[in-house]
Amino acid sequence: MNEEHRMERPGMQETRKIQKTGGSTYVVSLPKKWIQTSGLKKGDQVALSVTGDGTLTVDPHIPRASERLVKVIEVTHATDSKTLLRQLVGSYVTGWDVIEIRGKGRITPELRRTIQDFSRRVIGPEVVEESSNLVVLQDVADHADLDMRKVVRRMHLMSKNMLEESVRAVMDLDRGMAEGVISRDDEVDRLHWFVEKQHAMIRRNISFAAKMKTTWLESDSMLLASKAIERIADHATRIARSVGMLGDSRVDGDTMKALEQLGGEASSIMDRSVEALFKRDSTLANDCIERTAVLREKADAFLDETMKRRGRVAVGLAFVIESIERTGGYSSDIAEIAINLAEGQ
């Protein structure tokens, strides 16, 4: 095959022989088609990075420390807060370093409040410049210090506590505890967005993966696990909201004991699935998947018994049982991610 027609599709692979010139210099030729596609010429420099799995990558664009990726969002008096917030979140999670909000005229007080609220809700972006028609947000986070592995672990602990406390709030009809669970859901979302942002930054610049001492495979796995944990937090919040549906209705002791056991099993499976993820332990992950199947059977039987009741108590308990079952499902998803990561290393 002519060299000019090789390496035309992403993912294609070819082998090259290592040549030695002089006493200690090794040389590998680069595919001509790739050189042309990348817009390179003789004398240009490329960036070489060693990833966490030992792979050497060649980047045709050398990232500069001072070079920042800038996203510009244009707003008018017709722009509403919800639209702007969606644009800000989208720009954040896709890895932009700087977000400039430019107004065609003065930026309204309502939109400024939206920008400020967004800045408080996410990790990194802070207002560094502001005028009547411009607000500039810049990412000031130390990504090497707070990498996605640490964030996922933090999300796990928060979501686990939320799950356990939400079940306890239902058992005790404790509205204060339930409100505490609900108030923490935004923090889990905040952490998940940060994982999304770091994943996007790694995809944009492979040298960032080397800086974070990770690989694309691990980054993909952490993102998927983060999403599953975020959904577990959502279901813990849903369980907490069920306290209001139960009102002051007391539930019999046997039902509460069964609910406590079901919630405890779901929490345990979640713990072990995250442990399997970080240990890359396929055996442990498979055990979590099997335990989830048993949990589903118990939850379905419990739900059938619950639906024999009448009124708001039955509806409230049904919401709780379904959410506990869904939590087990998301934990099983994490276990599958752990297996994929373990087998892919």
Where in this protein do the model-derived segments appear?
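Iron-sulfur (Fe-S) cluster-binding modules
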Residues: 1
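Cytosolic, long alpha-helical scaffolding segments
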Residues: 4-18, 23-25, 29-345
